[in-house]
Amino acid sequence: MLILISPAKTLDYQSPLTTTRYTLPELLDNSQHLIHEARKLTPPQISTLMRISDKLAGINAARFHDWQPDFTPENARQAILAFKGDVYTGLQAETFSEDDFDFAQQHLRMLSGLYGVLRPLDLMQPYRLEMGIRLENARGKDLYQFWGDIITNKLNEALAAQGDNVVINLASDEYFKSVKPKKLNAEIIKPVFLDEKNGKFKIISFYAKKARGLMSRFIIENRLTKPEQLTGFNSEGYFFDEASSSNGELVFKRYEQR
């Protein structure tokens, strides 16, 4: 199984590292093209394009300027330990064993606007470039056109390497849109997480994001290899609802805490 998750806007380059092992991103030539385009933007243009504050725009303009392709442990950090959003709160990769990192390196991929596809131990320099941003480039009007089939092809390589044809889509719609399902050599399973609020079950963004991380951790810790094993997921009160599920969608629910 190949697990797909989104990156995070929040980054952590300060906490102690729990592994010293690392690999290098496989699509850095493409990243360099995007950095070249991003460096043309002024901080006010970045602010408008990304809908972020002037302060954040200044930080990200500096990141684009400082980015350089020779990644080392001194100027970069393993992606799975650098991202710190809601998904990664659930994943808690900082508590992984070396065996967990081994399994994750084979079975987990992070989709990225700048790096395309990241393996957990791939070094990553800090950036902010969300997949949905309309950054014009030599290949088209946005990042979806820039990446084209590249991300899908890289995922197919990972599937072939593990002799498997199942993708667990735990990425957001914004990021999964960078994948071409018809060209992906895989059955796609999408777990959906619903929380009860006022007697009704619905997707609550913060909880759903954290649950995607919890599910990723569940798969990694238990070394799961078959989609049917996912139905045993019960972290933090979630349970599998077979009646609401279908072949491609596994629905998990959690009752409101009273």
UniProtKB/Swiss-Prot annotation:
Top-rank taxon: Bacteria
InterPro entries cross-referenced by the UniProt entry: YaaA
Pfam families: H2O2_YaaD (PF03883)
Ranges that cross the membrane: none
Any single biological process term in GO: response to hydroperoxide
Endpoints of the signal sequence: none
Family the UniProt entry places it in: Belongs to the UPF0246 family.
Protein name listed in UniProt: UPF0246 protein YaaA
Organism from which the protein derives: Shigella sonnei (strain Ss046)
Gene that encodes it: yaaA
